[in-house]
């Protein structure tokens, strides 16, 4: 109780010291978790992603600088050069950054190779340009077009900017995961620290108890909660800041994504347009070379048409290509005569939409300085042949700009012929010869031969591009020509209603005089920022949770502080009550046992007088009542000692079989009176001597057997002891029988339906055994002996509702149990506690109205000393005369026969079993006709071998066989013994008439079996030392001077009478002071019995003074200062002092040993206890009266 109080107080005192710091630490931890979340979410995500993007861009710039390429051209090459197309590109020169249109290389072949450089997969591969030849046959047109568009799609996804965004997003996700894990980890660590601190504070009670009264405690409470509130507010503000920061990041990333996607589309459209422009330039070179450079011309309409049809895959974005020849007015008539058609003008000058365009209906071109009639065209625009391109305003301006600058020129958007789409026309000029870069416009106009034009369907171009992009559904694209800022022309539009976000990307189509832009918007409105909401909410929840935990902890600690004073008072009261209870038990036990000692002592002295039968019965009844009261007191004291933890187990050597024989002897009279068969069986595998507490082991078995005897009116009580390992093996071999029941099946003549000791049904305890811990995991100690003890009865059983409280102190099955059967209900509770102290378990199984079986386990140690040492612990050594004898056990009930054979084997007798009369007769006939070595020495027949009095009938059958001449040698017949639980005088006459040598009364014990066999066989008596305690006590105490010290006159009379009964010379004194004066050396006393509790001076103090005097005298004798003759010629004085008290608790016994006493005798005296106490000191001087 004191320890409980200290722990309870410790929680209050220790908590006050670190409570404020604890709350502040919790708030700081929560705030640090929030900051960690923000850092991991923002800084790490952007830092990691941005670092990766910058590294990729640096490597791309290195490659661009190495090959003298601009970033836009390098990206155009990457998008253009798909796997099959990488076989075709030029070798001559580099691409001009200023004007991609004039950087058209020759139609030579080149190839890109990937050169492994290690490191990041996103870095741009090194480009190696190698010479090779162009070969159109190596192309697959369809695959080329598909690869070109697929490469454009991959460029959209895999460009450095996009990769940077993906790395950024991935790093952001990792940061979020890391931050959430870190925050949850902080919460878990905080909770663990809280629990650890609260446990640690319980150990600081004694060091901080004074803090409770200091005023700083209340101040600490107030500031702790204020700090907690501040921490929670900071955490909530942090969650709001996290939300706003993450939401701003989401918006910024959305805008950034829009910018990236819009710029990617604009760049891809520009790159694809530049590629097409290069192909148009190549056609211009083709016309210049093979049409104007050859005479006659190598190209006609058919050739041009076939060539452009077969190379359409090179110009997937163009709707048509045509070549117009420069014709002066002076050359018009000759030209028209040569070609056979008139030069026609365009229908309208403003290039309005023309549906169902028909060249036959066009008018001749009006007279002007020069004309540009179309002479070659692609099949798709074959209807424009003979049309004068100079007759249209947009086309005329386009031609004039192109031939003056030498570069490609674009028209303003206009409706294409035979379509409703807006388009543009790209015009390149074909010159007579190569002009220097610094040629003047006049020189260029003079060298002009014709014009190659290509029309682009802008809506189809944009749609085709967007279809190849995985993210085309995310944004809406519009394309404008803003050359005229006041009235921009919409070249491409979408009908989808887009969001408010807008990004504008510039597009350069190679004509510096025209400006184009792309407007991009998200198709859908932004969704809710769920990541920001969830993370900020999680932070807020974590902050509130941590705050609640700390708040609850503070409240709990405050409650502990408030209850500390009350707990301290209760602790003091509990300690006082505990002391009072112990003192009460000691006092009550002494005050009750002291008069009971007188009562029982006087009754014993009365029994030694001449009494008639009635008077003797009265005295015996009074003795039994007194012993019952003593036993009740012992049980209450045992329970008190167990509950207070003051009981300790001994570790001495003992014989299990001898203890069980003593228990059987104790209950023999009751078993005879009730007609119950009581038996014990110990497995041969159980060691002969064990190390443990024999008294507590005997108490457990005595309680269980006494409980069974109380509730059993017929049948049997069977005690069995086995090793747990042995039972486990049998349980594995036998599935349907009791684990310890190994008997063979009974003969059919046995009328009892069950093969048990009495033939009645018993409860199977297999499930109980399987629940024991030792059956699952036996002890691995080398010298450990694990015993299983089973007490089986055929009593009334235990009801289902009472089975749950059977081991509860002072509880019985029902209210009538105590009135009907007696008892207090604490025996089984004590038994359970003692079994647990022995390291075992106890359980039971019961069938109401049938039987009950109690089983318990216990752990002992095996005695591993010399086997000859075992004899010291066997009170009744077996006579060697029985060794080698043979016995036949005749019993139809095998369980009962096994008990008989167990006791015979203890005597060294070999046993055979005959379960039927036929087998018994056969064994007898064989024995009579056999040699002396194999003959039987004895036959033990159970009185109820095959039914009531069947044992007597069996011997009569033998007499009939002898009269008939079947048994010829009657003189060689073995001795016959009858085993019976009760033998009446009539049965004794029947035995003599039947010819039995003797009868052995059950329950069987080693001593009774040995005595009966010895008397009948005439062995084991010669020279045998008698072990009768009364005779030994007389030999030990005769002539011995004993001093009895007790303040109670009745106790002095009882003690003196008990000692004088055995021949001792007794002197009595009534105080400790008188005892000291009588025991001053030299004195005549051989031993002293001293009461412990006496007025003026108790037995403890008196003993200490006696030992002090003896020690001084012994020191002087050993030092030679005095002669031993002065002290009766004794060189060493030490009188045995034995405590004589009714207080039997452990504390009293320890006090006796500490003060110098030599032994302990509990009141009232009993013969066995008295012998055990004095024999150790006085037996050496005694002589055996029988030797």
Swiss-Prot record:
Would the keyword Metal-binding turn up in this protein's UniProt record? no
**Protein topology in the membrane:** Multi-pass membrane protein
Catalysed conversion reaction: ATP + protein L-histidine = ADP + protein N-phospho-L-histidine
**What are the BP-aspect GO terms?**
cytokinin-activated signaling pathway
Tissue-specific expression: Highly expressed in young leaves and at lower levels in roots, mature leaves, stems and spikelets.
**PROSITE patterns annotated for this entry?**
CHASE, HIS_KIN, RESPONSE_REGULATORY
Q: Which GO terms describe its cellular component?
A: nucleus; plasma membrane
Regarding how it is modified after translation, the entry says: Activation probably requires a transfer of a phosphate group between a His in the transmitter domain and an Asp of the receiver domain.
Q: What is its main location?
A: membrane
As stated in the Swiss-Prot or TrEMBL entry, residues carrying the post-translational modification Phosphohistidine are 590
Null mutant phenotype reads: Extreme dwarf, low tillering and no heading phenotypes.
Q: Tell me which Pfam families the record gives.
A: CHASE, HATPase_c, HisKA, Receiver_CRE1, Response_reg
User: Where does the UniProt annotation locate this protein?
Assistant: Cell membrane
Question: What is a single molecular function from GO for this protein?
Answer: phosphorelay sensor kinase activity
Q: Which domain of life is it from?
A: Eukaryota
Give EC number(s), comma-separated: 2.7.13.3
- Summarize the protein's role: Cytokinin receptor related to bacterial two-component regulators. Functions as a histidine kinase and transmits the stress signal to a downstream MAPK cascade.
Return the protein name.
Answer: Probable histidine kinase 5
């Amino acid at each position: 109780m004191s320890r409980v109080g200290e722990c309870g107080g410790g929680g209050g005192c220790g908590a006050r010291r670190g409570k404020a710091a604890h709350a502040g630490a919790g708030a700081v931890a929560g705030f640090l978790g929030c900051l960690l979340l923000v850092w991991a979410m923002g800084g790490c995500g952007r830092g990691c992603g941005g670092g990766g993007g910058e590294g990729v861009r640096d490597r791309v710039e290195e490659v661009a600088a190495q090959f003298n390429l601009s970033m836009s051209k390098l990206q155009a090459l990457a998008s253009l050069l798909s796997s099959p197309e990488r076989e075709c590109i030029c070798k001559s020169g580099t691409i001009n950054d200023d004007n991609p249109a004039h950087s058209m290389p020759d139609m030579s072949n080149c190839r890109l190779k990937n050169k492994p450089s290690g490191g990041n997969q996103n870095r741009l591969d090194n480009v190696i340009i190698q010479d090779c030849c162009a070969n159109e046959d190596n192309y697959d047109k369809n695959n080329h077009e598909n690869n070109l568009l697929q490469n454009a799609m991959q460029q959209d996804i895999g460009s450095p900017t996009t990769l940077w965004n993906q790395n950024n997003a991935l790093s952001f996700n990792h940061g979020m995961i890391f931050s959430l894990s870190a925050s949850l980890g902080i919460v878990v660590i905080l909770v663990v620290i809280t629990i650890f601190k609260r446990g640690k504070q319980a150990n600081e009670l004694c060091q901080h108890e004074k803090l409770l009264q200091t005023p700083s405690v209340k101040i600490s409470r107030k500031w702790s909660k204020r700090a907690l509130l501040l921490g929670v507010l900071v955490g909530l503000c942090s969650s709001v800041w996290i939300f706003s920061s993450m939401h701003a990041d989401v918006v910024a990333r959305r805008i950034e994504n829009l910018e990236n996607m819009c710029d990617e589309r604009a760049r891809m459209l520009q790159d694809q347009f530049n590629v097409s422009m290069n192909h148009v330039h190549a056609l211009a070179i083709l016309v210049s070379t093979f049409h104007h450079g050859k005479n006659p011309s190598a190209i006609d309409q058919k050739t041009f048409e076939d060539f452009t049809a077969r190379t359409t895959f090179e110009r997937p974005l163009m709707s048509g290509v045509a070549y117009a020849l420069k014709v002066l007015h002076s050359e018009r008539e000759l030209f028209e005569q040569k070609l056979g058609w008139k030069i026609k003008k365009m229908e309208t000058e403003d290039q309005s939409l023309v549906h169902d365009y028909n060249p036959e209906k066009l008018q001749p071109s009006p007279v002007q300085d020069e004309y540009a009639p179309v002479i070659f065209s692609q099949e798709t625009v074959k209807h424009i042949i003979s049309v004068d391109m100079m007759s249209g305003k947009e086309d005329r301006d386009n031609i004039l700009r192109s031939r003056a600058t030498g570069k490609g020129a674009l028209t303003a958007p206009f409706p294409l012929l035979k379509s409703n789409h807006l388009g543009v026309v790209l015009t390149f000029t074909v010159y007579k010869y190569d002009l220097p870069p610094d040629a003047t416009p006049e020189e260029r106009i003079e060298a002009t031969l014709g014009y190659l034009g290509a029309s682009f369907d802008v809506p189809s171009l944009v749609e085709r591009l967007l279809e190849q992009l995985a993210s085309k559904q995310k944004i809406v694209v519009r394309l404008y020509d803003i050359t005229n800022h006041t009235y921009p022309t919409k070249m491409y539009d979408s009908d989808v209603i887009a969001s408010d976000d807008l990004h504008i990307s510039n597009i350069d189509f190679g004509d510096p005089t025209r400006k184009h832009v792309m407007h991009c918007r998200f198709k859908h409105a932004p969704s809710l920022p769920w990541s920001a909401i969830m993370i900020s909410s999680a932070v807020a929840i974590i902050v509130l949770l941590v705050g609640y935990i700390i708040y609850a902890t503070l409240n709990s600690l405050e409650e502990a502080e408030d209850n500390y004073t009350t707990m301290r008072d209760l602790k003091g009261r509990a300690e006082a009550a505990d002391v009072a209870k112990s003192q009460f038990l000691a006092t009550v036990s002494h005050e009750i046992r002291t008069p009971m000692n007188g009562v029982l002592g006087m009754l014993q002295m009365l029994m030694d007088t001449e009494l008639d039968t009635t008077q003797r019965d009265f005295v015996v009844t009074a003795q039994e009542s007194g012993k019952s009261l003593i036993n009740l007191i012992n049980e209450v004291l045992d329970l008190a000692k167990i509950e207070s933890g003051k009981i300790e187990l001994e570790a001495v050597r003992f014989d299990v079989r001898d203890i069980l024989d003593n228990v059987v002897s104790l209950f023999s009279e009751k078993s005879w009176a009730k007609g119950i068969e009581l038996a014990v069986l110990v497995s041969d595998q159980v060691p002969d001597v064990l190390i443990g507490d024999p008294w507590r082991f005997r108490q457990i078995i005595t309680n269980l057997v006494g409980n069974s005897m109380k509730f059993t009116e017929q049948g049997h009580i069977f005690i069995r002891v086995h090793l747990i390992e042995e039972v486990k093996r049998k349980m594995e071999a036998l599935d349907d029988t009791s684990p310890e029941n190994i008997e063979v099946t009974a003969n059919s003549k046995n009328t009892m339906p069950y093969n048990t000791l009495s033939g009645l049904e018993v409860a199977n305890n297999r499930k109980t055994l399987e629940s024991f811990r030792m059956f699952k995991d036996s002890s691995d100690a080398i010298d450990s002996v694990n015993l299983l003890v089973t007490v089986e009865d055929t009593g009334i059983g235990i009801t289902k509702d009472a089975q749950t409280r059977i081991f509860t102190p002072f509880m019985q099955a029902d209210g009538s149990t105590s009135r009907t059967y007696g008892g207090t209900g604490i025996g089984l509770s004590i038994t359970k506690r003692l079994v647990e102290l022995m390291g075992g378990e106890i359980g039971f199984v019961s069938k109401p109205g049938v039987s009950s079986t109690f089983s318990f386990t216990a752990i002992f140690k095996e005695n591993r000393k010399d086997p000859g040492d075992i004899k010291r612990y066997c009170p009744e050594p077996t006579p060697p005369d029985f060794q080698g004898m043979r016995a036949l056990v005749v019993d139809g009930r095998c369980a009962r026969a096994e008990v008989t054979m167990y006791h015979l084997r203890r005597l060294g007798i070999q046993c055979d079993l005959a379960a039927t009369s036929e087998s018994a007769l056969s064994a007898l006939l064989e024995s009579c006709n056999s040699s002396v070595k194999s003959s039987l020495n004895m036959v033990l027949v159970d009185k109820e071998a095959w039914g009531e009095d069947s044992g007597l009938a069996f011997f009569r059958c033998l007499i009939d066989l002898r009269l008939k001449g079947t048994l010829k040698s009657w003189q060689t017949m073995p001795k016959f013994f009858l085993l019976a639980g009760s033998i009446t005088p009539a049965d004794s006459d029947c035995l003599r008439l039947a010819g039995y040598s003797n009868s052995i009364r059950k329950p069987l014990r080693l001593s009774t079996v040995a005595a009966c066999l010895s008397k009948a066989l005439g062995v084991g008596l010669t020279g045998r030392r008698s072990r009768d305690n009364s005779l030994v006590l007389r030999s030990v105490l005769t002539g011995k001077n004993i001093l009895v010290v007790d303040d109670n006159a009745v106790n002095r009379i009882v003690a003196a009478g008990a000692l004088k009964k055995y021949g001792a010379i007794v002197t009595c004194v009534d105080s400790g002071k008188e005892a000291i004066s009588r025991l001053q050396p030299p004195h005549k006393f051989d031993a002293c019995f001293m009461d412990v509790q006496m007025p003026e001076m108790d037995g403890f103090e008196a003993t200490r003074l006696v030992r002090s005097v003896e020690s001084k005298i012994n020191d002087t004798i050993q030092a030679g200062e005095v002669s031993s003759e002065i002290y009766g010629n004794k060189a060493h004085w030490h009188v045995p002092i034995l405590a004589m008290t009714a207080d039997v608790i452990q504390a009293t016994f320890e006090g006796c040993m500490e003060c110098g006493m030599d032994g302990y005798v509990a009141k009232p005296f009993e013969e066995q206890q008295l012998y055990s106490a004095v024999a150790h000191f006085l037996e050496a001087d005694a002589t055996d009266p029988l030797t």
